[in-house]
Amino acid sequence: MPIPTVTLRALRADITTLACDAIVNAANSALLGGGGVDGAIHRAAGPELLEACRALHGCRTGQAKITPGFLLPARYIIHTVGPIWRGGRQDEAALLAACYRNSLALAKQHDVRTIAFPCISTGVYGFPPQLAAPIAVRTVREHGADLDDIVFCCFSAADLALYETALNEAR
């Protein structure tokens, strides 16, 4: 079902530079920083983020937790833990959809109107990007009606092409 009032778009950018109400962090279960987008967000947000994440006591796969944005332009950081790809037979698709759904639910609770998502689980967690993009777009279209602007922030040109295709096919 289309969302008439929300803008969904993909762009290639550094998610830590986006001025929106919330950015989503593709975190690990400890929430203590790591590689990829998680490490970039922790470095850009400053040391207060690590302290705030310690107080959250981790996060389970598919769930989401929230902290202030600290030194980022975004007001909030929503941390979600994507599934590790194990061949697709261990509910990876459902867990990935849960990351988007639970991040959006948390955004709604905090009156977030604009949000940016990275490509969750497609880096070191190995989720095939060509499968992840349609799951992300479909889930956000189904559960993002309360927002004004939803951005899929892609690191690579290849990811951007996948998200643009998924967005066009969903229209």
Curated annotation (Swiss-Prot):
Record domain Macro: where: 1-171
GO molecular function terms attached to this record: deacetylase activity
SMART domains: A1pp
Alphabetical list of SUPFAM superfamilies matching this protein: Macro domain-like (SSF52949)
Highest taxon in the source lineage: Bacteria
A Pfam short name: Macro
S-S bridge residues: none
Family: Belongs to the MacroD-type family.
NCBIfam families, sorted: PRK00431.1-6
Record-given protein name: Macro domain-containing protein RSc0334
Species the sequence originates in: Ralstonia nicotianae (strain ATCC BAA-1114 / GMI1000) (Ralstonia solanacearum)
